[in-house]
Amino acid sequence: MLNLCHALRGVRQFSCSVIVKVKCASCSIKLQDQDPSKPGYYTKPKSLPDSKLNPDLQDLKYLLFSQDIQLSKQAIQNDPDLKTKRDLLLRVICKRCSNALHHNNYNPEEFPESTLNDILNYVPRGSNVMHIVPFVEFPLHLDPNVLKRNDLETTLVLTKSDQVFKDKNAVSKKVPIFMKQFLKNTLRIDSNKTFAISALKNWNISMFYNYFKNYTYLLGNPNVGKSTLINTLLQKYLGYKVKIDSTGKINSPSEEVMQEAFTNPKNFFKIQAAGVSHIPNLTRSVQAYQVGGKILFDLPGYSTSTSRLRLEEPIDERWLQRLRKTDLFNRKHIKQKTYESMKGTSQGGCYTVGGIFYLVPPKGSINQIVKYIPGPSKTFKNIEKGIDVFNSCNSSSGTHPLSRYCGIKSVICEKSQYKRYAIPPFIGSIEIVLKDIGYILLRTTGRYEFKGLHEIWIPRGIQVGIREPLENLIESGYQRYIETNGKESSCPRDRPIISSLYEMAPDEADTLNAVKKSYLEKTEKDLSARRFVDDDPYDLVQHLRKKKESLLVLPMVRLAVHLVAPISSNAHVNMNVSKLKRKLGTKYIQKRIYRK
């Protein structure tokens, strides 16, 4: 049972006639009703119409005719929805949030981005921080600058785990072991403080609640699941919004307010819930919540890149809602893994989901694709054909026969607006991750023969990376860890498991040597990574299958790609594999993101 006399910091007392809330219930900004052009503007809610309580003449005639006068009178007097509507009037939100949430009408400029330093101004030194990262797009939202700070007590929380794993067994047991070793090998961070959860599926929520301390801050990028997590906690532990003054004093709620938490918890939650939206940067100020006997702070999301593309610009708003609304994710893809087949062509045949990206396999390759991105997929003869079709869709106002496949706006109408990336050569499967969009699994089939590099074309400003298939990687690593009684690492140390891609010129024909050249330019001062610069990369990739001693020993994907110095100085790297990596010249995400 909650200690009701404990901190309800900031829930204002109110009556049905006077609204005294001072913050938007959705974005937590201070409300004002004087200047519509300034942030926080809202219109005062109107009272319920008298007609709700006093039926008009036509209503009375109908009631007389149906002989339900007495029943209708009782229904009006005891209508539980009437009280709900009155109470929801008290959940005041600003005009900006009202237009965005209820009418899907918003200007992205009214949702400004914040930097990490901006957000950390809200967090006192030495505070407990939960770094929220969506596991489904790991590692693109993982910020080592947060995890490495000495002035914060940071725990890594991986949300949306139900979009990666079939059940919570792996989430509760296997992920923490894997992440402990991943952080140690990759970031030199020795930490046991990792949780994988699913707020929608209620996976590990009780464990998470028992772990987090009083006065904890939730920190992460926009739309990573902070507000959804808070709402799950509020429902499970009967939590509510609070306000803390400058002295740290907690203002207790009125008995009337708290009584409703027990008499009508559903309505109580509607009033107290955090604002959840597919729109990024909705939260503009810190909002505190009382969850059981603990205070939890929801911080605004922050962005790590000033050149990041706002997805509202190129992507159709209906498609964007499907991408961002976690509850619409179809988990049957996790269980069934239904794939689509595609063969590479000499014309540059491509695979796309809405025009958001174009995947171009090399000529003659046979590929299987498992899509974890909402929306129908389509193949085209080449990228130019795809762009031409989608341009026609945008100009036809929805009458084009292929309009259902178009997920981009008319602003993306030329091939030059896409960046071309080369994917390192691989045997088996990889997952291609697009930040804030999702991921696809790409698998090559048949006998290995190097036919060229896979390519992916993406609108400029969208981050992309590849990884070994995450579920299989963690499952096999855990099995190895258990069988050896912890002597073998759950996270591979003989190879990086995530990689960045290389941008190519649109007209570049020799992509493999272009990758090598680019790598050498970026590692000019890294002598250990340039020991085999004179070897021909084509000779290597043509005979990968013959080098079984150096490739097939690598479990799962066997990425035959990466050529950077070992992740850590004590990594036990097979010399043949190490030599192969250095010859091919592929740069890793670890080097690009994690190393300063």
Curated annotation (Swiss-Prot):
Transit peptide span, please give it: 1-21
**Is this entry keyworded Lipid metabolism?**
no
A GO CC term attached to the entry = mitochondrion
Q: Which SUPFAM superfamilies match?
A: P-loop containing nucleoside triphosphate hydrolases (SSF52540)
Pfam families referenced in this protein's UniProt entry, alphabetically:
MMR_HSR1
The keyword Cytoplasm belongs to this UniProt entry's keyword annotation: no
According to the UniProt entry, its GO molecular function terms are: GTP binding
Q: Where is the CP-type G domain?
A: 113-305
InterPro entries recorded: G_CP_dom, GTP-bd, Mito_lipid_metab_GTPase, P-loop_NTPase
Q: What is this protein called?
A: Genetic interactor of prohibitins 3, mitochondrial
Which UniProt keyword terms apply here? Mitochondrion, Transit peptide
Localization: Mitochondrion
| Described function | Interacts genetically with prohibitins and thus may be involved in the mitochondrial lipid metabolism.
Family (UniProt): Belongs to the TRAFAC class YlqF/YawG GTPase family. GEP3 subfamily.
